[in-house]
């Protein structure tokens, strides 16, 4: 699963996801992509599950690019622990995804296969997404 090799600080504030993505909104690598339509924290496990669904459906043909990286540590306290006594330990990593962000790109497969594969990947994600295609110049 994806996670940073090292970080400056172990824990981060929760924060809020405001506005729309100002970068990563266009296809840069592949012919087809999956664009986020909602703001949400997407976990490393969800990204990995979507990646596996993509590659399995494409039968290892073509190429996949993951355009989001889980760089936010999410902490949680153990179950049945009273409030207070500090913040919990880092539990997993997540990526803050804004609307308009391209999450996955694929290339080297036909349109119908790409649409099916990205639809399967979208089912593994907690947000609404849209299939996008590069416009031929």
From Swiss-Prot:
Q: Which InterPro entries match?
A: Ribosomal_uL16, Ribosomal_uL16_bact-type, Ribosomal_uL16_CS, Ribosomal_uL16_dom, Ribosomal_uL16_sf
Gene Ontology cellular-component terms listed: cytosolic large ribosomal subunit
Pfam families assigned to the protein according to its UniProt record, in alphabetical order: Ribosomal_L16
Example of a GO MF term: structural constituent of ribosome
Give the PROSITE patterns listed for this entry: RIBOSOMAL_L16_1 (PS00586), RIBOSOMAL_L16_2 (PS00701)
Q: Organism's domain of life?
A: Bacteria
Q: Which keywords does this chain's UniProt record carry?
A: Ribonucleoprotein, Ribosomal protein, RNA-binding, rRNA-binding, tRNA-binding
Q: SUPFAM superfamilies this protein is in? A: Ribosomal protein L16p/L10e
**What GO biological process terms are annotated to this protein in UniProt?**
translation
Quaternary state and partners of this protein? Part of the 50S ribosomal subunit.
Q: What does this gene product do?
A: Binds 23S rRNA and is also seen to make contacts with the A and possibly P site tRNAs.
Name the protein family: Belongs to the universal ribosomal protein uL16 family.
Tell me what this protein is called: Large ribosomal subunit protein uL16
Organism, by scientific name, is: Azorhizobium caulinodans (strain ATCC 43989 / DSM 5975 / JCM 20966 / LMG 6465 / NBRC 14845 / NCIMB 13405 / ORS 571)
Q: Which gene encodes it?
A: rplP
